[in-house]
Curated annotation (Swiss-Prot):
GO molecular function, one term: NAD binding
Organism: Staphylococcus aureus (strain JH9)
Binding site for NADPH: S11, F12, K32, K106, A141, R256, V280, E282
Highest rank taxon of the organism: Bacteria
Family statement: Belongs to the NAD-dependent glycerol-3-phosphate dehydrogenase family.
EC number in record: 1.1.1.94
Gene that encodes the chain: gpsA
Name of the protein described by the UniProt record: Glycerol-3-phosphate dehydrogenase [NAD(P)+]
Length: 332
């Protein structure tokens, strides 16, 4: 039995906390919202994010950062990308011993263009860092928490961290493969959110299966181009952390990125869509980061460029689709 602290009480962190508890581990969740903490401790639910799920009664929650830090030597970092550096820094300020960090965030930091593992590495002093890994792949929290068969990938620069992650999470409904390409797995999880928003737009406009298939295929191509430029193995993008995550995020209404895109395709403004969703949509921030990163690295990413124009320059979605279709003739 292993003690694990889960930082973050969103949908995926909650679903994975439930997996860990059902696997026999001691789980403490940390969150800032005292009402959510009290609800989990009293009712064993987290209705804001997983409305109908009844959680393992052995999961406990706290808003006390010191208690959360002292509880375990393994931390599951289930926070939005934009909050990761701040919380990791707060953790570091209170550490007195080495900890292992496993994150499930799917984004790239605005401004620095850093992957999440790099953000954590920046924030945690080397003397307290026992290793950093990621768990990623096609895994909607709504399905994981009700034990629908799900398969994901664990990756780290340290193979022992990948193996630890596999051992902690794997059971009869959650299968975990290890993968040595940390860069590729992290980029696959982050970049697919851009394509998922675009896929939602295509669906919201009412375009057919031909357009959806083309978008995912060409989206995977530009993900691979940037990934290879940044040091990833292109083959990673044909695995769970790449095309697997891309497919599930581009076709499902469980996906908040797809849902945002769908609302935009239906004619809603971004502010209106986000106010209705009341959730963090990583694809917005990732699009901003990757748009500038691709320009810096001189990588052609036409779908990302088009989505950036929709999200940040108020260009109409139909105009951007027209521009994509009328690009210069090229070989595939």
């Amino acid at each position: 039995m292993t003690k694990i602290t889960v930082f973050g009480m969103g949908s995926f962190g909650t679903a994975l906390a439930n997996v860990l508890a059902e696997n026999g581990h001691d789980v403490l969740m940390w969150g800032k919202n005292q009402d959510a903490v009290d609800e989990l401790n009293t009712c064993h639910t987290n209705k804001k994010y997983l409305k109908y799920a009844k959680l393992d009664v052995n999961i406990i929650a706290t808003s006390d950062m010191t208690k959360a830090i002292q509880f375990a030597d393994i931390y599951l970092m289930a926070l939005p990308t934009k909050a990761m550096r701040e919380v990791a820094t707060q953790i570091n300020d209170k550490l007195t011993s080495k900890k292992t960090f496993i994150h499930v965030a799917k984004g790239i930091e605005n401004g620095t263009f850093k992957r999440v593992s790099e953000m954590i590495e920046d924030s945690i002093s080397p003397e307290y860092n026992a290793g950093i890994g990621v768990l990623s792949g096609p895994s909607h929290a709504e399905e994981v928490v009700v034990k629908q068969p799900t398969t994901v990938a664990a990756s780290s620069k340290d193979k022992s961290v990948s193996k630890l992650t596999q051992d902690l999470f794997m059971n009869d409904y959650l299968r975990v493969y290890t993968n040595d390409d940390l860069i590729g797995v992290e980029l696959g999880g982050a970049l697919k959110n851009i394509i998922a928003v675009a896929s939602g737009i295509v669906a919201g406009i009412g375009y057919g299966d031909n357009a959806k298939a083309a978008l995912m295929t060409r989206g995977l191509a530009e993900i691979s181009r940037l990934g290879e430029k940044l040091g990833a193995d292109p083959m990673t993008f044909l695995g769970l952390g790449g095309i697997g995550d891309l497919i599930v995020t581009c076709i499902s209404t469980h996906s908040r990125n797809f849902t945002l895109g769908y609302k935009l395709g239906q004619g809603e403004s971004m502010d209106q869509a986000l106010s209705e969703m009341n959730m963090v949509v990583e694809g917005i921030y990732t699009t901003k980061s990757v748009y500038h990163l691709a320009k810096e690295k001189n990588v052609d990413m036409p779908i990302t460029n088009a989505l950036y124009r929709v999200l940040f320059e108020n260009i109409s979605v139909k105009e951007c689709v027209k521009d994509l279709m009328e690009r210069d003739k090229k070989s595939e």
